[in-house]
């Protein structure tokens, strides 16, 4: 039985942004500094997109959404629909309108997939929303555990994160491809989340091997950045010279 979310889809006239835009809440550097409590109500999502990824306050789960349905992926391996009252310190949304579709019908590693997609794109200086549906030979994910105050920096929080391995699984990977110049505001390169076909489990994607998948890409020309109106954000250190290394530590594959 399908579990119901309290998030409601809005009509086109009620939406607050154009389809060529990414609406992002806060910055990756603030998350690195331990700003885990945001003021963005996830009930607002339908104004800004039907597709996206992010996290929840206290880092209590990974956020994934597509086709107007959004889920919380917790560190215990469960997936539940987003509810009214849920908040996020960092998330990105867009209205997904396909510009390119590509079929993968043979085994392909993450590295080979990224090379192939990169060669198809009109420019690496634009933003793209990426969706992959189908059968995956494997998907490796993580979900950071819920944090309690006083918060530690994210490089410390990820040290105890559980790792999940899915084999021969059907599901959907969604996320964004961000140009290098925007690293720190967002996560440069491919930043992806996964949920299985049954909407039971998933997480932040570390690695994957495609088996029989359809890739859909939506090109984005604009970013609307909303900054948190909170004391934690006002007082955060966003001038960390090691932020690029810290992003690789927190978002990249485990060693």
UniProtKB/Swiss-Prot annotation:
Induction note: Strongly induced under anaerobic conditions. Activated by ResDE, Fnr and ArfM.
InterPro entries: Acetolactate_a_deCO2ase (IPR005128)
EC number: 4.1.1.5
Reactions this protein catalyses: (2S)-2-acetolactate + H(+) = (R)-acetoin + CO2
Gene3D superfamilies attached to this UniProt entry: Hypothetical protein, similar to alpha- acetolactate decarboxylase, domain 2 (3.30.1330.80)
BP GO annotations: acetoin biosynthetic process
Keywords associated with the record: Acetoin biosynthesis, Decarboxylase, Lyase
EC supergroup of this enzyme: lyase
GO molecular function, one term: acetolactate decarboxylase activity
Pathway(s) the chain acts in: Polyol metabolism; (R,R)-butane-2,3-diol biosynthesis; (R,R)-butane-2,3-diol from pyruvate: step 2/3
Disulfide bonds: none
Purpose: Converts acetolactate into acetoin, which can be excreted by the cells. This may be a mechanism for controlling the internal pH of cells in the stationary stage.
Protein family (similarity comment): Belongs to the alpha-acetolactate decarboxylase family.
Name of protein: Alpha-acetolactate decarboxylase
Species in which this protein is naturally found: Bacillus subtilis (strain 168)
């Amino acid at each position: 039985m399908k579990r119901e979310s309290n998030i409601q889809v809005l009509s086109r006239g009620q939406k607050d942004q154009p389809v060529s835009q990414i609406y992002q809440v806060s910055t990756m550097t603030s998350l690195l500094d331990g700003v885990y409590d945001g003021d963005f109500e996830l009930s607002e999502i339908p104004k800004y997109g039907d597709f996206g990824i992010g996290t929840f306050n206290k880092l209590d789960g990974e956020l994934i959404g597509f086709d107007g349905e959004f889920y919380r992926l917790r560190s215990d391996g469960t997936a539940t629909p987003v509810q009214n009252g849920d908040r996020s310190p960092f998330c990105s949304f867009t209205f997904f309108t396909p510009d390119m579709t590509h079929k993968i019908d043979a085994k392909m590693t993450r590295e080979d997939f990224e090379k192939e997609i990169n060669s198809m794109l009109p420019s690496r200086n634009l933003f793209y929303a990426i969706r992959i549906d189908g059968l995956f030979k494997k998907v490796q994910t993580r979900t950071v555990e819920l944090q309690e105050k006083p918060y530690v920096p994210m490089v410390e929080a990820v040290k105890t994160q559980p790792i999940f391995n899915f084999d021969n699984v059907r599901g959907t990977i969604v996320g964004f491809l961000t140009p290098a110049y925007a690293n720190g505001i967002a996560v440069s390169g491919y930043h992806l989340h996964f949920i299985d076909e049954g909407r039971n489990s998933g997480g932040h994607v570390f690695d994957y091997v495609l088996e029989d998948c359809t890739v859909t890409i939506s090109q984005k020309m604009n970013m609307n950045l909303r900054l948190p109106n909170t004391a934690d954000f006002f007082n955060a250190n966003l001038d960390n010279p090691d932020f690029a290394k810290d992003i690789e530590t927190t978002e990249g594959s485990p060693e």
